[in-house]
Amino acid sequence: MARRHGWQLPAHTFQVVAITVFFLLTVAYYAFFAPFLGNKLYEYIAIGVYSFLAFSVLVLYIRCTGIDPADPGIFVKADNTPAHKSQNSNYVPENASAIDGGPYIRHGSGCCSAIGRFICGCLVIQDCRRDTQQEQSNEQEEALFCSLCNAEVRMFSKHCRSCGKCVDGFDHHCRWLNNCVGQKNYISFVCLMAASFFWLIAEFGVGVTVFVRCFVDQKAMEHLITEKLGLGFSRPPFAAVVVVCTTLSLLALIPLGELFFFHMILIRKGITTYEYVVALRAQTEPLGTSVDELDQTSQYPSPASSAVTATSARSSLGLSIQYRGASLCTPPNIFVDQQDDVIQHLEPGPVRSTIDPDSLSQKKPPQRQQVRINPWKLAKLDSKEASKAAAKARASSSVLLPVSSRQNPYKTSSNVSGRSSPGRGKPADSESCSLSSPGLTRDHFNPMYMSSPANESPLNEEESRNAVVAARRNLPSSDESSVVWDPEAGRFVSLSRIPGTDVGGPLGNECLNTITSTGTDRSRRARGNPLTGYFQQVRSQRGDQLPVFMPTDSQLHRHLSTRFH
């Protein structure tokens, strides 16, 4: 389930720590820091400045955590609400009902309720961006489809697995806020960092001043401690509390300052944290193996690389079939069950006898190196390279797909599809494969690439017969073997193995004519065809075995004579 905002349970541990430290330092400042400056004027100024900074931090933190940074397209489909109302948590659909089934009635207490809703609305309303309308018009032309959210999102959105939704203008997921930082709350996030930075500076500065006065003006500090805190507190415990709170503020100030200046450089370069991380990973990590290299180096059998399905050569009809790694049809799933059970120690290369082979299979794959925020590396990074790396990462994402891929989820860049199925509206297509590959057209004689739809026009039938006649003229002499496609057996059959089926003979011509006939003509001719009984006999003898092509006696004799001469 997608998270609406950072206040939604469960709360992150870092979020609880951040809230606890904020209230701890605030209480420590008003109780142990400001009253011990030794001057009423300094005390009032310090309390006034600190109160403004602390209140700003509190409001901005509530705002950054409460804003929903999600892409406006992911909740429109789920709630059936308008886009401008989907971001408002107070909007209730017309058909909404209460728990008891009755109509939902909103109760309020008049002016107080209206003021409360106004304050909450001001806290959770998204940031105003001058370039929002221009970016929306550009992103609508290049929208993406999120397969996890099942919705169309904008071009620069990214799916956050921690929040379970796509974030508009994703920058990063902040664990201290328990919320994502995106286009809708990025300005508030930068203001929160600035306010927190100066708030911690004020805390640290006043804490150092009070700690120094504990040793410089001991009598005055002891008098103030007794006056403000009572007799139960002495100077050493007071100094210890001041040191702890001052050190805590310093430990929070250093990483926060680094993060603040890091985002200042990001704004200067015009990139996001996500683009920075992707660019550094592209520089440090080695490039992944391409799909072609995986196919070449794979030594384990699979349906795409087995010797039966990856048949590629020159047919005996003299027609060259050129394709890369494409199987003629999808084979049985005989290797898929064992494809994941690969023993890693059987890979090429020697294995030392002192190493247990079974322990090698238990090794975990290497994890990605965590990219740390570094303003110095960011200053040296080229913004154009970072944008290109982010665009490449979005293009290779398996979650965010182009909108066109939603209409055809099995569409790939290759012309060969591994998921081919017969068309529902064409009965004759069930006996042929609708597989296409480079260099293959309908003019080829191979019946695998020639479909004979039932509603084919007479002109197309005549053209196909002419193609068959033209192919016959290019056939070799009758003493060589010829092969025809048996649609019922699902394989090629040699005509030279059957008496009277030489090319040019009555049975051979009948076989070639049978290939170009439609479904009804094919079944009618097959009843009177002497080859039908032979095909059925071969299939009964073959059983469930895969087809095997055996050389004829003439081919074997010619091959032996060529080797010895």
From Swiss-Prot:
The record lists the organism as Arabidopsis thaliana (Mouse-ear cress)
Q: Which reaction does it catalyse?
A: L-cysteinyl-[protein] + hexadecanoyl-CoA = S-hexadecanoyl-L-cysteinyl-[protein] + CoA
Enzyme group, top EC level? transferase
| This protein's encoding gene | PAT21
Per the UniProt record, which EC number(s) apply here?
Answer: 2.3.1.225
This chain belongs to which protein, by name? Protein S-acyltransferase 21
| Transmembrane residue ranges | 16-36, 42-62, 192-212, 247-267
Active-site residues annotated for this sequence: 174
What are its GO cellular component terms? plasma membrane
Q: How does it sit in the membrane?
A: Multi-pass membrane protein
Family label: Belongs to the DHHC palmitoyltransferase family.
- Source organism phylogeny: Eukaryota, Viridiplantae, Streptophyta, Embryophyta, Tracheophyta
